[in-house]
């Protein structure tokens, strides 16, 4: 089965060609935990730094601001067809009858007629107003097959170009593939040298599903930009640790969506083309020990005494 592949033209940003044939820019601007200046960051990323890929989600609470930034960029002369916009449906809307209305709200907030990629944010359904952590009865049964069929209908109706999944396990991915008429084009997962997520990564490669890496620098508790191994490679290559971590993801064959609200960092994060991490240094980065996920999903889905998920291991099907 054909897999997504990277391409680059002179002076152009790297892209990955998805199974659908659509081109996905390899570096996108992440907007998780973005602030009130999100519109400015999006416009700056596109018009000044050269980004053509913006990743957001309904649950981030910034889609309206992202929409303002996209509109400003297009008013500045950027064609919509040259942009790749990703969003995600939240867990409270993971019922077949809620899929289309959820997307329509996203399109309205983003001020767009279509989006390029629409993800299932997490493969779990939550009751409206669910607490963190969830109380008894707030994690509901998820009709994965029914929801995916409605996602497929969005593609058929031209509202979405590609559909994908986030935070899936191999078990859940295999279940979805058994019924999907349009397989997921992309699987978005936490990935960095401190959490390589090899099992789902290899499963996606087997099925020709492209992988996007989120949290490429780790977390505030374990910021890999301060890891001595990363710093040593960065100093050797005369790059920043952040650039090295982003490049590591690209050389691994994944797209990547670093987030920053600082103009200087936004520009720095996309200056990762035209150079390579040498093989010996790449192997050194790969040797960083896997420690823990940034996002376990525990506070969202785990009730230790009631409900289907009593631990983070349950959330991840005890796969890692």
Swiss-Prot record:
Going by the UniProt record, its keywords in alphabetical order are: NADP, Oxidoreductase, Stress response
Active site: which residues?
Answer: 60
Q: What reaction does this catalyse?
A: an alditol + NAD(+) = an aldose + NADH + H(+); an alditol + NADP(+) = an aldose + NADPH + H(+)
Kindly report, in one word, the top-level EC class recorded for this enzyme: oxidoreductase
Question: Binding of NADP(+): at which residues?
Answer: 215-269
**For substrate, which residues are the binding ones?**
121
User: Could you tell me the EC number(s) of this protein?
Assistant: 1.1.1.21
Similarity comment text for this entry: Belongs to the aldo/keto reductase family.
Please identify the protein, giving its name as recorded: Aldose reductase
């Amino acid at each position: 089965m054909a897999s997504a592949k990277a391409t680059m033209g002179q002076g152009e940003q790297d892209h990955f060609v998805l199974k659908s044939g659509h081109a996905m820019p390899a570096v996108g601007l992440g907007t998780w935990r973005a602030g009130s200046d999100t519109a400015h960051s999006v416009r700056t990323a596109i018009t000044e730094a050269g980004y053509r890929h913006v990743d957001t989600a309904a649950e981030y609470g910034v889609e309206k601001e992202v929409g303002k930034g996209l509109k400003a960029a297009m008013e500045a002369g950027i064609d919509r067809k040259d942009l790749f916009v990703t969003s995600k449906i939240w867990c409270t809307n993971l019922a077949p009858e809620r899929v289309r209305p959820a997307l329509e709200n996203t399109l309205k907030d983003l001020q767009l007629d279509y989006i390029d990629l629409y993800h299932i944010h997490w493969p779990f359904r939550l009751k409206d107003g669910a607490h963190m952590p969830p109380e008894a009865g707030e994690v509901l049964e998820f009709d994965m097959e029914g929801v995916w069929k409605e996602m497929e209908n969005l593609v058929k109706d031209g509202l979405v170009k590609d559909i994908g999944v986030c935070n899936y396990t191999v078990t859940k991915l295999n279940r979805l593939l058994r019924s999907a008429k349009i397989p997921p084009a992309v699987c978005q997962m936490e990935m960095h040298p401190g959490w390589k997520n090899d099992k789902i990564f290899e499963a996606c490669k087997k099925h020709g599903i492209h992988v996007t890496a989120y949290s490429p620098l780790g977390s505030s508790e374990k910021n890999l930009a301060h890891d001595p191994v990363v710093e040593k490679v960065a100093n050797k290559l005369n790059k920043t640790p952040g650039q090295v971590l982003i490049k590591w993801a690209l050389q691994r064959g994944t797209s990547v969506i670093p987030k920053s609200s600082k103009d200087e960092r936004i520009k720095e994060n996309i200056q990762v083309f035209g150079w390579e991490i040498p093989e010996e240094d790449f192997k050194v980065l790969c040797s960083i020990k896997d420690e823990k996920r940034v996002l376990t999903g525990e506070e969202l889905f785990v009730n230790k005494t009631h409900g289907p998920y009593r631990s983070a291991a349950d959330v991840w099907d005890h796969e890692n």
